[in-house]
């Protein structure tokens, strides 16, 4: 995994604006034309690569445009046995955060009524998901059967990177962590939380290992380490939540046991929705759990106004030797604003002063695709690179 040896490197969290071939790609895939879909996937990846390179992104990804939505039942039912769809009752949310305490706060009653009617994000031109009426539910022993599917997907992406002249072994490929899966995969089979989390971890282990076996860096996306805290209703104490989160971290490490640490980066944020976030758990309460995850690099939301001061945590917490911190220095929460390079540079300099310049890579708070208009998202990555260059001049001279 690359480090900022001579300058601050840049990266992002995975999801980027869809390529111009997106409509044709989806049509080909829906019609079962696998040959045409593969061609268009390659075209799309190469377009995304070009966009990243033009803006100065160092550690790139494929943009994730070809991946199914988080709650796409075909993804789960096609790759794992033991999962099915169960019709949700009238009062049953179809994901864990459906009735978080903040959504019931009278201070924000009109805000959430507006969100219910109009949605969370401005119109970004992104694909929209239909409202779910069923719960994805574990009803029996989980078993992975998607080996051939994931290998085929990874080979298509690898080939597209190769045709674009990119060394895919220095690119990252995101996958959902066990804890994040728990947001929308319910369980009617396992008797305890421990059994549930370890079953999810073991069932998804094949996906994680396939990514690394194909030569990519695995990025494990786990907003749940932070964002699940404000979803419990009634709320948990910090101590009780830490016990719940620690169990999920243990299960995550179980799933990663066969993967070298230097091929893993771990992403945490407080959820990508544009809510007030008044009930977010402070980073100081989970930073030790974060550092317990088997990974070389830790990507953390850090630029939005609710969490911009989180850099202060690193005054009292030592980043372990050999680890890399990827603070978000541009974000999705300011979806219509582009950060100035000077603001980006200042944020990076603060982190570098606390954990060491060679241990910092400039990142984004979360995926920008679908959360910002494409024009704004690409401009944010341009600002990211320009800000990293400014910080590098000041840190290296």
Q: Could you tell me what each predicted segment is?
A:
Residues 1-397:
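Domain-level signal for soluble alpha/beta catalytic cores
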């Amino acid at each position: 995994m690359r480090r900022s040896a001579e300058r601050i490197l840049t990266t992002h969290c995975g999801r980027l604006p869809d390529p111009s071939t997106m409509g044709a790609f989806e049509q080909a895939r829906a019609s079962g034309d696998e040959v045409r879909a593969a061609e268009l996937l390659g075209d799309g990846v190469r377009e995304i690569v070009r966009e990243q390179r033009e803006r100065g992104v160092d550690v790139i990804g494929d943009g994730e445009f070809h991946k199914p939505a988080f709650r796409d039942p075909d993804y789960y039912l096609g790759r794992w046995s033991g999962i099915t769809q169960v019709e949700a009752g009238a009062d049953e949310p179809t994901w864990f955060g459906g009735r978080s305490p903040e959504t019931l706060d009278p201070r924000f009653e009109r805000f959430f009524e507006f969100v219910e009617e109009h949605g969370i994000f401005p119109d970004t031109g992104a694909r929209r998901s239909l409202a779910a009426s069923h719960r994805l539910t574990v009803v029996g022993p989980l078993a992975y059967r998607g080996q051939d599917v994931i290998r085929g997907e990874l080979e298509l992406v690898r080939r597209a990177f190769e045709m674009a002249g990119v060394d895919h072994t220095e690119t990252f490929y995101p996958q959902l962590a066990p804890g994040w899966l728990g947001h929308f995969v319910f369980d009617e089979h396992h008797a305890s939380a421990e059994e549930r989390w370890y079953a999810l971890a073991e069932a998804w282990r094949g996906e994680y290992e396939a990514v690394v076996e194909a030569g990519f860096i695995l990025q494990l996306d786990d907003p749940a380490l932070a964002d699940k805290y404000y979803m419990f209703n009634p709320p948990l104490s910090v101590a009780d939540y830490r016990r719940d989160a620690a169990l999920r971290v243990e299960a995550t490490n179980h799933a990663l046991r066969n993967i070298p640490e230097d091929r893993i980066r771990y992403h945490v944020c407080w959820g990508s929705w544009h809510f007030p976030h008044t009930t977010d758990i402070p980073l100081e309460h989970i930073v030790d759990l974060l550092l317990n995850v088997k990974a070389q690099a830790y990507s953390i939301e850090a630029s939005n106004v609710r969490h911009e001061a989180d850099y202060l945590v690193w005054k009292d917490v030592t980043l372990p030797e050999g680890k890399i911190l990827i603070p978000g220095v541009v974000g999705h929460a300011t979806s219509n604003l582009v950060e100035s390079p000077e603001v980006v540079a200042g944020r990076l300099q603060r982190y570098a002063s606390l954990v060491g310049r060679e241990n910092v890579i400039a990142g984004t708070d979360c995926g920008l695709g679908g959360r910002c208009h494409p024009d704004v998202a690409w401009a944010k990555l341009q600002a990211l690179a320009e800000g990293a260059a400014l910080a590098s001049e000041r840190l290296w001279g």
